[in-house]
């Protein structure tokens, strides 16, 4: 069974969070029934005390390497079973809308992997927001996860808000259907990150709002408004 084969891959990588969701909400629903979404933890789970941009970027690259390995394994299974699939690109389409073709974050929330935090990043109970997401659209039906429909960040937690260097975050709790512009000024964030292209040869990774999040910190019990 296809689903069992896919789950077997993740059983060999127990630190990776994964789930399935239907994509009836997506314009790609005419071509694919489902999305497999998974979250690979960064190489280091940095806090503000040990954060540097270089270490954060290295953590992203470490997670990206593992992610690519998993994707290749899943691709082999799908090809063997002659199942139609598509791997959406990570990158945004352009510098105007700053949106990807398929939102990994939306799919992750609907698959039950995590919720949108006040920093507009997916927050997982296990690692907080310090994960790299990927998704594969698959033309099959699976056992779907329980979706998140609202944020679980404590109302009085503002750590990501306060640490943001360009003050792009608006201290708003997420609910399903809320536009991201109500949570974050993405253009302001993007302008700040883009200012480093000449110096670094790329946008700065800037993960301060991820490092500040108390969810998933080693030795710290997560607290939510739902506890």
Language model regions located:
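Non-catalytic, usually N-terminal nucleic-acid engagement modules in DNA/RNA processing proteins
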Residues: 1-72
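Catalytic cores of enzyme domains
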Residues: 63-227
